[in-house]
């Protein structure tokens, strides 16, 4: 049963195996983690603009083959609209992709694992953890 949605920065930490303590948390939660298709898009973007795109794409694809990837659906978009409107009213907007990822995790009842809690803590009813 899925419990956690990994943010892009957490995926990168696990792939790079730094910091080391993240690997034990990752391994302890095998089978309980997923990523959003939004995170997948961010990973491909990072690989494409890197010095070694082909190598980095292969690493990403190998890593993702071991995780569940959740597709972004209309119900997630509805949460996106709600979150963005609330943050806008407060004058506390966060990055567009971060809102999509937060909406995806919140609407699925998942805990978002990120090293960017300063922004994600602004999102009402989003459960978060930092494994770093």
Curated annotation (Swiss-Prot):
Origin superkingdom? Bacteria
What SUPFAM superfamilies does the record point to? Answer: PIN domain-like
Where in the numbering of this chain does the PINc domain appear? 4-123
Does 4Fe-4S show up as a keyword for this record? Answer: no
Is ATP-binding tagged as a keyword?
no
Gene that codes for this?
Answer: vapC
The UniProt record lists the EC number as 3.1.-.-
Tell me the GO molecular function terms: magnesium ion binding; RNA nuclease activity
**Keywords, in A-Z order:** Hydrolase, Magnesium, Metal-binding, Nuclease, Toxin-antitoxin system
Query: Entry's HAMAP family?
Result: VapC_Nob1
> Which residues are Mg(2+)-binding?
7, 98
Would you tell me the protein name for this molecule? Ribonuclease VapC
> Per its database record, what is this protein's job?
Toxic component of a type II toxin-antitoxin (TA) system. Acts as an RNase. Its toxic effect is neutralized by cognate antitoxin VapB2 but not by non-cognate antitoxin VapB1.
Q: Which residues form a coiled coil?
A: none
By its UniProt entry, which PANTHER family does this protein fall under?
RIBONUCLEASE VAPC2
Assembly and binders: Probably forms a complex with cognate antitoxin VapB2.
Which family is this sequence assigned to? Belongs to the PINc/VapC protein family.
């Amino acid at each position: 049963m899925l419990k956690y949605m990994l943010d892009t920065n957490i995926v990168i930490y696990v792939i790079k195996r730094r910091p080391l303590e993240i690997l034990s948390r990752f391994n302890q939660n095998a089978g309980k983690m997923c990523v959003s298709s939004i995170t997948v898009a961010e990973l491909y973007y990072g690989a494409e603009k890197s010095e070694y795109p082909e190598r980095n794409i292969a690493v990403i694809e190998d890593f993702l083959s071991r995780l569940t990837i959740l597709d972004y659906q209309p119900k997630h978009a509805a949460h996106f609209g709600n979150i963005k409107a609330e943050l806008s009213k407060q004058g506390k907007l966060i990055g567009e992709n971060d809102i999509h990822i937060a909406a995806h995790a919140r609407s699925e009842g998942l805990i978002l694992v990120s090293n960017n809690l300063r922004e994600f803590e602004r999102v009402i009813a989003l459960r978060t953890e930092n494994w770093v």
